Amino acid sequence: MSLDLALDVQYATASDYLPSEEQFSLWVKTAIGNSMEQAELTIRIVDARESQMLNSTYRGKDKPTNVLSFPFEAPPEIELPLLGDLVICAAVVENEAREQDKILEAHWAHMVVHGCLHLLGYDHIEDEEAEEMESLETQLIESLGFTDPYKEQ
């Protein structure tokens, strides 16, 4: 079974390197895997100002962040393939990759996989949940040909 994906990528900022829609599509399909037959998802690439505003509004943290996940929650009687939205801050992803000595493309892939897992209901608030989510992220990222994102460089 292959995922029927309707992906809308919105580039709301410019940068030296932004992944292509094809890369985003591959990363989303890898993260979602066989958990859904159809999925609709928006990925919005933003600057630090927009990320900070959204992070402040929805999480109470007045600073930009790497990825925000906004799951779509339909009433139980309505079945829709709408998974939700990811908002990714290009500047934060670039800074983190540089500071953590990670390959920029690998860090982008990790942020997309991480965000998609949140949209699928995974979380990392409790230690046990965090271990499960990180283990799955590592498997998915390694399946894309990148190294373990949680391994110390």
Swiss-Prot record:
It holds the Pfam family YbeY. One of its GO terms (cellular component) is cytoplasm. GO terms for biological process: rRNA processing. Binds 1 zinc ion. Zn(2+) binds at H114, H118, H124. The keyword Zinc-finger does not apply. Its cofactor is Zn(2+). GO terms for molecular function: metalloendopeptidase activity; RNA endonuclease activity; zinc ion binding. Coiled coil: none annotated. Its EC number is 3.1.-.-. SUPFAM superfamilies: Metalloproteases ('zincins'), catalytic domain. Keywords: Cytoplasm, Endonuclease, Hydrolase, Metal-binding, Nuclease, Ribosome biogenesis, rRNA processing, Zinc. Gene3D superfamilies: Metalloproteases ('zincins'), catalytic domain. Its main location: cytoplasm. InterPro entries: MetalPrtase_cat_dom_sf_prd, YbeY, YbeY_CS. It is found in: Cytoplasm. It comes from the Bacteria. The keyword Membrane does not apply. Disulfide bonds: none annotated. Belongs to the endoribonuclease YbeY family. Single strand-specific metallo-endoribonuclease involved in late-stage 70S ribosome quality control and in maturation of the 3' terminus of the 16S rRNA. This is Endoribonuclease YbeY. It comes from Shewanella sp. (strain MR-7). The lineage of its organism: Bacteria, Pseudomonadati, Pseudomonadota, Gammaproteobacteria, Alteromonadales.
